[in-house]
Regions:
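Membrane-interface interhelical loops and short amphipathic "cap" helices
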Residues: 1, 138-146
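Membrane helical hairpin/interfacial module
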Residues: 2-67
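Short intrinsically disordered, low-complexity coil segments enriched in acidic
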Residues: 2-5, 164, 176
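Hydrophobic alpha-helical segments with transmembrane-like composition
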Residues: 10, 17-18, 24-26, 54-62, ...
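Membrane-interfacial loop-to-transmembrane alpha-helix junctions, especially the N-terminal start
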Residues: 34-43, 111-118, 176
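Coil-to-alpha-helix initiation sites in intrinsically disordered, low-complexity, charged segments
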Residues: 35, 68-72, 140
Protein backbone atom coordinates (compact mmCIF):
# COMPACT_ATOMS: atom_id res chain seq x y z
CA UNK A 1 0.00 0.00 0.00
CA UNK A 2 2.80 2.44 0.90
CA UNK A 3 4.42 1.81 -2.48
CA UNK A 4 1.18 2.65 -4.32
CA UNK A 5 0.69 5.83 -2.30
CA UNK A 6 4.28 6.99 -2.82
CA UNK A 7 4.87 5.81 -6.39
CA UNK A 8 1.46 6.63 -7.85
CA UNK A 9 -0.73 8.89 -5.76
CA UNK A 10 2.13 10.96 -4.33
CA UNK A 11 3.48 11.70 -7.78
CA UNK A 12 0.17 13.12 -8.96
CA UNK A 13 0.14 16.04 -6.52
CA UNK A 14 2.37 18.46 -8.45
CA UNK A 15 0.82 17.78 -11.89
CA UNK A 16 -2.64 18.13 -10.32
CA UNK A 17 -1.63 21.42 -8.69
CA UNK A 18 -0.24 22.67 -12.04
CA UNK A 19 -3.44 21.65 -13.83
CA UNK A 20 -5.66 23.39 -11.27
CA UNK A 21 -3.45 26.49 -11.46
CA UNK A 22 -3.71 26.53 -15.26
CA UNK A 23 -7.47 26.07 -15.09
CA UNK A 24 -8.20 28.85 -12.60
CA UNK A 25 -5.57 31.23 -13.94
CA UNK A 26 -7.17 30.96 -17.39
CA UNK A 27 -10.58 31.82 -15.92
CA UNK A 28 -9.15 34.76 -13.92
CA UNK A 29 -7.11 36.08 -16.86
CA UNK A 30 -10.31 36.65 -18.82
CA UNK A 31 -11.72 38.80 -15.99
CA UNK A 32 -8.53 40.41 -14.71
CA UNK A 33 -5.32 40.45 -16.74
CA UNK A 34 -3.37 40.94 -13.51
CA UNK A 35 -4.46 37.58 -12.10
CA UNK A 36 -1.10 36.06 -12.93
CA UNK A 37 0.69 38.67 -10.80
CA UNK A 38 -1.55 37.81 -7.83
CA UNK A 39 -0.78 34.14 -8.39
CA UNK A 40 2.97 34.75 -8.50
CA UNK A 41 2.80 36.91 -5.36
CA UNK A 42 0.97 34.12 -3.58
CA UNK A 43 3.51 31.51 -4.70
CA UNK A 44 6.40 33.79 -3.79
CA UNK A 45 5.04 34.51 -0.32
CA UNK A 46 5.14 30.81 0.58
CA UNK A 47 8.36 30.19 -1.32
CA UNK A 48 10.25 33.00 0.43
CA UNK A 49 9.12 31.85 3.89
CA UNK A 50 10.10 28.23 3.27
CA UNK A 51 13.33 29.29 1.56
CA UNK A 52 14.41 31.32 4.58
CA UNK A 53 13.65 28.37 6.84
CA UNK A 54 15.66 25.97 4.67
CA UNK A 55 18.56 28.37 4.16
CA UNK A 56 18.83 28.70 7.93
CA UNK A 57 18.60 24.91 8.14
CA UNK A 58 21.40 24.66 5.57
CA UNK A 59 23.60 26.84 7.74
CA UNK A 60 22.90 24.70 10.81
CA UNK A 61 23.86 21.60 8.80
CA UNK A 62 27.09 23.25 7.55
CA UNK A 63 25.83 22.95 3.98
CA UNK A 64 27.55 26.20 3.02
CA UNK A 65 30.80 25.58 4.91
CA UNK A 66 33.87 26.67 3.01
CA UNK A 67 32.04 28.88 0.52
CA UNK A 68 33.27 32.41 0.02
CA UNK A 69 30.71 35.21 0.43
CA UNK A 70 30.41 35.51 -3.36
CA UNK A 71 29.94 31.76 -3.84
CA UNK A 72 27.43 31.67 -1.00
CA UNK A 73 25.31 34.41 -2.56
CA UNK A 74 25.60 32.80 -6.01
CA UNK A 75 24.56 29.40 -4.61
CA UNK A 76 21.55 30.76 -2.73
CA UNK A 77 20.35 32.88 -5.67
CA UNK A 78 20.81 30.04 -8.17
CA UNK A 79 18.93 27.64 -5.92
CA UNK A 80 16.15 30.18 -5.37
CA UNK A 81 15.71 30.92 -9.08
CA UNK A 82 16.42 27.52 -10.61
CA UNK A 83 16.23 24.55 -8.24
CA UNK A 84 14.34 25.53 -5.14
CA UNK A 85 16.28 26.38 -2.01
CA UNK A 86 15.77 22.83 -0.76
CA UNK A 87 15.25 19.76 -2.93
CA UNK A 88 11.50 19.41 -2.36
CA UNK A 89 10.82 23.10 -3.10
CA UNK A 90 11.71 22.65 -6.80
CA UNK A 91 8.10 23.16 -7.87
CA UNK A 92 7.97 26.81 -6.74
CA UNK A 93 10.35 28.25 -9.37
CA UNK A 94 8.93 25.84 -11.96
CA UNK A 95 5.33 26.81 -11.17
CA UNK A 96 6.18 30.52 -11.26
CA UNK A 97 7.72 30.04 -14.71
CA UNK A 98 4.66 28.05 -15.79
CA UNK A 99 2.35 30.88 -14.67
CA UNK A 100 4.42 33.46 -16.59
CA UNK A 101 4.40 31.35 -19.77
CA UNK A 102 0.65 30.70 -19.48
CA UNK A 103 -0.05 34.41 -18.99
CA UNK A 104 1.83 35.41 -22.12
CA UNK A 105 0.35 32.53 -24.12
CA UNK A 106 -3.14 33.79 -23.20
CA UNK A 107 -2.20 37.42 -23.80
CA UNK A 108 -0.69 36.70 -27.23
CA UNK A 109 -3.39 34.11 -28.05
CA UNK A 110 -0.86 31.29 -28.49
CA UNK A 111 -2.44 28.75 -26.17
CA UNK A 112 -2.97 26.10 -28.86
CA UNK A 113 0.72 26.17 -29.75
CA UNK A 114 1.56 25.57 -26.09
CA UNK A 115 -0.93 22.70 -25.89
CA UNK A 116 1.15 21.00 -28.59
CA UNK A 117 4.43 22.00 -26.93
CA UNK A 118 3.09 20.65 -23.63
CA UNK A 119 2.24 17.28 -25.20
CA UNK A 120 5.68 17.09 -26.82
CA UNK A 121 7.36 18.01 -23.52
CA UNK A 122 5.39 15.33 -21.72
CA UNK A 123 6.29 12.66 -24.28
CA UNK A 124 9.96 13.72 -24.12
CA UNK A 125 9.84 13.62 -20.33
CA UNK A 126 8.16 10.21 -20.26
CA UNK A 127 10.94 8.87 -22.49
CA UNK A 128 13.66 10.33 -20.31
CA UNK A 129 12.63 9.20 -16.84
CA UNK A 130 15.50 7.11 -15.59
CA UNK A 131 13.46 4.16 -14.32
CA UNK A 132 12.26 3.46 -17.84
CA UNK A 133 15.45 4.30 -19.71
CA UNK A 134 13.56 4.22 -23.00
CA UNK A 135 14.87 7.55 -24.25
CA UNK A 136 18.52 6.60 -23.82
CA UNK A 137 18.10 4.04 -26.60
CA UNK A 138 16.45 6.44 -29.04
CA UNK A 139 17.70 9.93 -28.24
CA UNK A 140 21.36 10.39 -29.07
CA UNK A 141 23.36 11.94 -26.24
CA UNK A 142 20.54 11.72 -23.71
CA UNK A 143 22.64 9.69 -21.28
CA UNK A 144 25.15 12.55 -21.09
CA UNK A 145 22.40 15.16 -20.77
CA UNK A 146 20.81 13.25 -17.91
CA UNK A 147 24.09 13.41 -15.97
CA UNK A 148 23.99 17.22 -16.07
CA UNK A 149 22.66 18.39 -12.70
CA UNK A 150 20.47 21.17 -14.13
CA UNK A 151 18.72 18.68 -16.44
CA UNK A 152 16.77 17.24 -13.51
CA UNK A 153 15.09 20.56 -12.86
CA UNK A 154 14.52 21.38 -16.52
CA UNK A 155 13.10 17.88 -16.88
CA UNK A 156 10.68 18.38 -13.99
CA UNK A 157 9.44 21.64 -15.49
CA UNK A 158 8.94 20.21 -18.97
CA UNK A 159 7.29 17.04 -17.68
CA UNK A 160 5.33 17.88 -14.53
CA UNK A 161 4.59 21.60 -14.77
CA UNK A 162 4.29 22.97 -18.32
CA UNK A 163 2.12 20.19 -19.84
CA UNK A 164 -0.26 20.12 -16.90
CA UNK A 165 -0.52 23.89 -16.61
CA UNK A 166 -1.64 23.96 -20.23
CA UNK A 167 -3.90 20.95 -19.67
CA UNK A 168 -5.72 23.09 -17.10
CA UNK A 169 -5.82 25.89 -19.65
CA UNK A 170 -7.24 23.47 -22.24
CA UNK A 171 -9.92 22.18 -19.85
CA UNK A 172 -10.93 25.76 -19.07
CA UNK A 173 -11.07 26.64 -22.78
CA UNK A 174 -13.15 23.58 -23.68
CA UNK A 175 -15.50 24.22 -20.77
CA UNK A 176 -16.30 27.73 -22.03
Amino acid sequence: VAKVVNAALGRMAVPFFACVTGYFLTKHEKKDSRGWIKNIKSLLSYYVVFSVIYIIWGFTQHEFAGLSAGDLIYTIVKRFVMYGTYYHLWFFPCMILGVVILHFAIKWKREKIFWIIGILCYVFGACTYTWYGIGEHFILGLDRLMQWFDFTYIHRFTTAILPFTFLGNYISAVEN
